[in-house]
Swiss-Prot record:
GO terms for biological process: xylan catabolic process. The active site is at E155, E253. Its EC number is 3.2.1.8. It comes from the Eukaryota. This is Probable endo-1,4-beta-xylanase C. Induction: Expressed in presence of xylan and repressed by glucose. Residues 47-316 form the GH10 domain.
Length: 317
């Protein structure tokens, strides 16, 4: 996750501080308006605790086209003990999405954080390879055909562009990426397979350059990476990611400190300008339930009312 600060200075064509800043939510759902430009979805995240809130659920049904599990598909939730899986939370989200016609983005299969201690303690290559393959196979098999895309590996780069010193890299080296993606492709050949990371906002940033270089190399080696998920919000950076040869990219886990309308509009327009950018996921619905609630970063306030940023996006679309 990354929180965007005040980067953009462009002015909106309507004055959000005036009477013109009316609630135009009823005019069009943000997902429908975004899809009218040829995009696939404008989504959000959730889990059973937030999906069960009536106001929150009503907004998801009306305004968003895709759901990403906030925590329920992470390793500590799905396999807290070796070989003992718990799918209660993930099942709830996937069933909710099916019942309400929403796409699902699976998040996430391989991540250094929210990882059980028993996985972190593995030091043997053969054991970790077996554990990694079994985890990916078991989780993906349960939802085969029900998940549009999976974040197969998540946040594997350091800020300087080196590969993060996770248990996966320490024990398996760079090969853990190949193992993860090849296993995922074998389980569900039709799901889109993503590498996901944050702080890829500048095409010249070391982390962005490392992502581009490595994905090009991995694709050339036949590793089945379909997409890059990023919090990038400038079209130049998104274009750099698209140049790797992946079939699609997506803006993921987006929230903006203070929910500045011009910044949210800039993010939306950046995706519209890059053909391979197929969707945007805002990391939550209401500020009330945001993991950064003190920053008021989302499109709906603590009373579940649309904020100026929501109306600004609709107006821009």
């Amino acid at each position: 996750m990354v929180v965007l600060s005040k980067i953009f200075s462009c002015a909106l064509f309507l004055s959000l501080g005036s009477a013109a800043a009316i609630d135009i939510r009823q005019t069009s759902s943000i997902n429908n308006a975004f899809k009218s430009h040829g995009k696939k979805y404008f989504g959000t995240c959730g889990d059973q605790n937030t999906l069960s809130i009536p106001q929150n659920s009503a907004i998801i049904k009306a305004d968003f086209g895709a759901l990403t599990p906030e925590n329920s598909m992470k390793w500590d939730a799905t396999e807290p003990s070796r070989g003992k899986f718990n799918f209660a939370g993930a099942d709830h989200l996937v069933n909710y999405a099916k019942q309400n016609g929403k796409l699902v983005r699976g998040h996430t299969l391989v991540w250094y954080s929210q990882l059980p201690a028993w996985v972190k303690a593995i030091s043997d290559k053969q054991t970790l390879t077996s554990v990694l393959k079994n985890h990916i196979t078991t989780v993906m098999s349960r939802y085969k055909g029900q998940v549009y895309a999976w974040d197969v590996v998540n946040e594997i780069f350091e800020e300087n562009g080196s590969l993060r010193n996770s248990v996966f890299y320490r024990v398996l080296g760079e090969d853990f990426v190949r193992i993860a993606f090849e296993t995922a492709r074998a389980v569900d050949p039709h799901a889109k397979l993503y590498i996901n990371d944050y702080n890829l906002d500048s095409a010249n940033y070391g982390k962005t350059q490392a992502m581009v270089k490595h994905v090009k190399k991995w694709l050339a080696a036949g590793i089945p990476i379909d997409g890059i998920g990023s919090q990038s919000h400038l079209s130049q950076a998104l274009s750099a990611l698209a140049s790797t040869g992946v079939s699609e990219i997506a803006i993921t886990e987006l929230d903006i400190k203070g929910a500045n309308p011009s910044e949210y509009v800039a993010v939306t327009k950046a995706c519209l300008e890059v053909k391979k950018c197929i969707g945007i996921t805002v990391w939550g619905v209401s500020d009330k339930n945001s993991w950064r609630k003190d920053n008021s970063p989302l499109l709906f306030d603590r009373n579940y009312n649309p904020k100026p940023a929501y109306n600004a996006i609709i107006a821009a679309l």
